[in-house]
């Protein structure tokens, strides 16, 4: 079983995902069951983290720290300009809110280090948690709208119904995007990142591949595509 755990950690699965995946792949095999806490214990406590030393993929663990650190679930409140006009999340169709119908997306930008001009645009489909990632050299409103158009335009209409986004000025050209794609944009309330929680969670997973402070001008499109591929192969507990 240890080899199975190590193999999954090297695929960048979290300990929780490793535990769930083993149960799914080896039904009825009690010898292949291991709890999330047991994996964490082996990584950080038992034998001074001996299991961690067996990982062969650089940064296979989501955090480089040598111990577990509790995470605050309270949203950070930053100072930023807001878009005064536009459809609010309260106007979004009920089918998007309950994830019953595919085609409703959440999106955001991940701003890189360095000159901070290069960024990643991330999109997550709310029903399937399917991820799209694209690298963008500049992130003015028109450039963001045009890249989003390129990302969405290749999708069938039935899986491109709406997009939920923060009220930041980077989406000031949302009408340009909607006219080009037919996809309506709905804006979260100020300081409410949990209203696009699937995207927030996915951005955290993307940081496994590109840690905070990464200069995205040094990242290739091939690397971005590989991160997208691995994320879409990753088992999701919410889909079980």
Where are these regions (language model features)?
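Secondary-structure boundary/capping micro-motif
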Residues: 1-198, 205-215, 229, 236
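Low-complexity acidic/polar repeat-biased segments
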Residues: 224-226, 234, 238-240
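Conserved, non-catalytic sequence blocks in retroelement Pol enzymes and Pol-derived host proteins
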Residues: 216-221
